[in-house]
Amino acid sequence: GLKTACVESRGALGGTCLNVGCIPSKSLLNLSENFHKAKKDFNQQGIEIDGIKLNIDKMMTNKNKSIQVLTKGVEFLFKKNKVTYFKGKGVLFSKNDIVVYESNNKRTNVKSKNIVIATGSAVSSLPGIEINEKNIVSSTGALSFDKVPAKLAVIGGGYIGLEMGSVWSRLGSEVT
């Protein structure tokens, strides 16, 4: 195969989906569904559990462990397949030249006949609304609340918005 290099600025492989998208969202969907079933459905099925309570710290730790296992798996595959991994940002200087500014302040020049640009996604803001990750959060922030918000308005009907609405509703938020 081709000699391959990957430049990733996030510091963890796997892109948006694995780090702040599909995977953490699905993890929280599963965990919140389990909580909801234990709290609302089990009793109707003859399974009685007293004192069910949510430990959001443990839930987030579980979600983060899922992400870590998968990112380490991607890193293992890179090593196994001899993919050079640069932690930093790449700047395209010509059709065959990339300068990589690594997170350790090292600068590396990479020449390549073939270049794939896969920039991932970034959070979009709305005009006049500042995302501060406190009371106005991005989808990334909604994946990492340290407590269940009493009320939550979700703007956007993409899959992450829908899933975050489901997660936080199951855990006790009033979601609009």
Which residues fall in each region the model found?
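Glycine-rich flavin
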Residues: L2-K3, E8-V148, T176
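Rossmann-like NAD(P)H-binding beta-loop-alpha module
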Residues: D146-T176
